[in-house]
C-alpha cells in the first residue's frame, strides 16, 4: 500500500451501504477504512427508534444477497431486527476493526498531482485514500419545522429520527406533524396509549394494504435447513419490488393504466378502513399514485376512526 495513504479505499458511513461496501472490499483484497460520525454502526436503524419502526420493503429483499437471514420474525422486519442484523454481518465477515467512530467528515478534495483524496474531519483529523465511497445516506440530519414560537413550547419536542425513549406518552396530549412514511408507522403505534392525538397533515399519502405477517418458527427452520427456499422467495419479492418501484413510481407517467389500478386499490382500501365520509375525503390524495412516495399500512387509516 502507498505509504502516503491511510487506506486504498475510505468509506464514509456505516449503515447498510457502508457495511456492504466494506464486506465486498475485504473480499476483493482492498485495504479500507469506514469512517462513522456516531459511536456505533447501523445507520438509519441506529438513529431511528420510534414506536412502530419497520422496513417497508420485505425483509427477504432488504438484506444482503450473500447473507440471507433465515430468522426474520416478520415479512417486514422491525427496526431492532435490522439493527441486530447489521451487527451480525459486521461480526461474521470480520470487518469490525475497519471502523473509526466519532469522525464527522467535513470536506474532501482530490489532489490531482498525487492522485489522492484528502478527507478532513470537523475535529481536524485527516485521512488519505485513493478512492472514496460515500455511504452517508440521504436523510441523516433531522430538522424541526420552523414554527414561530416553537422555542417557547412548554411541552416535550421529539423528532422521530432522534426518539427520546425516556418520555412516557401515556395519557398525554400528542401532536404529530406530517403524514409521510414515518407518520404512517408512528401514529397507529402511539394512538392507543395517548390521551388525545392530533395529526397535522399538509398532503395525504396513498396507502396500500401491507402484506405483513409473522414468520412461523417452522418456516424459519425450513429456511435454515434448505436455504434455496428462502432464495426462491427473495427472487419473487425482488421482482415484485422492482416492478412496483420502476413502473408505478419511477415511470408512473408511462403506465397510466397501472397507476389507475393502484389508485383504485388504495381508494377501496380507504373505504374499508375509514368510516366517516369527510375523514375519507381528507385522507384522499389529490395527486396521482407514484407522484409522491406511497406507503404500506394495515392500521394507519383505521386510526382516524377514533
What are these regions (language model features)?
Residues 260-306:
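Alpha/beta-hydrolase fold catalytic core
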Residues 16, 45-47, 72, 106-120, ...:
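Tryptophan-centric aromatic hotspots in well-structured domains and transmembrane helices
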Residues 3-5, 14-16, 20-40, 134-272:
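Rossmann-like dinucleotide-binding core of oxidoreductases
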Residues 74-140:
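Feature captures the FAD/FMN-dependent oxidoreductase FAD-binding
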Residues 92-94, 148-152, 301-305:
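Short, conserved catalytic or adaptor-binding loops enriched in Gly and charged residues
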Residues 11, 16-99, 202, 273-278:
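Beta1-alpha1 glycine-rich phosphate/pyrophosphate-binding loop at the start
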Residues 69-88, 254-262, 288-299:
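Short beta-strand to alpha-helix junction loop
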Amino acid at each position: 500500500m502507498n505509504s502516503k495513504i491511510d487506506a486504498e479505499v475510505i468509506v464514509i458511513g456505516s449503515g447498510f451501504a457502508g457495511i456492504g461496501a466494506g464486506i465486498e472490499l475485504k473480499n476483493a483484497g482492498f485495504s479500507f477504512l469506514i469512517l462513522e460520525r456516531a459511536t456505533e454502526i447501523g445507520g438509519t436503524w441506529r438513529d431511528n427508534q420510534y414506536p412502530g419502526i419497520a422496513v417497508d420493503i420485505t425483509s427477504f429483499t432488504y438484506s444482503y444477497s450473500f447473507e440471507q437471514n433465515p430468522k426474520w420474525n416478520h415479512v417486514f422486519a422491525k427496526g431492532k431486527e435490522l439493527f441486530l442484523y447489521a451487527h451480525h454481518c459486521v461480526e461474521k465477515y470480520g470487518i469490525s476493526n475497519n471502523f473509526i467512530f466519532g469522525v464527522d467528515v467535513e470536506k474532501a478534495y482530490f489532489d490531482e498531482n498525487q492522485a489522492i483524496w484528502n478527507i478532513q474531519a470537523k475535529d481536524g483529523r485527516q485521512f488519505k485514500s485513493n478512492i472514496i465511497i460515500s455511504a452517508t445516506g440521504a436523510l441523516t440530519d433531522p430538522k424541526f419545522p420552523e414554527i414561530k414560537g416553537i422555542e417557547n413550547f412548554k411541552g416535550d419536542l421529539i423528532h422521530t429520527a432522534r426518539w427520546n425513549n425516556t418520555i412516557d406518552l401515556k395519557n398525554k396530549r400528542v401532536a404529530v406533524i406530517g403524514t409521510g412514511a414515518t407518520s404512517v408507522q408512528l401514529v397507529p403505534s402511539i394512538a392507543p396509549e395517548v390521551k388525545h392525538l392530533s395529526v397535522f397533515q399538509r398532503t395525504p399519502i396513498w396507502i396500500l394494504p401491507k402484506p405483513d405477517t409473522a414468520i412461523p418458527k417452522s418456516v424459519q427452520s425450513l429456511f435454515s435447513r434448505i436455504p434455496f427456499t428462502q432464495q426462491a422467495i427473495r427472487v419473487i419479492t425482488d421482482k415484485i419490488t422492482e416492478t412496483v418501484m420502476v413502473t408505478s413510481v419511477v415511470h408512473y407517467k408511462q403506465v397510466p393504466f397501472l397507476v389507475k389500478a393502484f389508485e383504485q386499490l388504495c381508494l377501496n382500501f380507504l373505504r374499508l378502513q375509514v368510516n366517516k365520509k369527510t375523514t375519507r375525503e381528507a385522507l384522499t390524495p389529490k395527486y396521482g399514485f407514484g407522484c409522491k412516495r406511497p406507503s404500506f399500512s394495515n392500521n394507519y387509516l383505521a386510526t382516524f376512526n377514533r
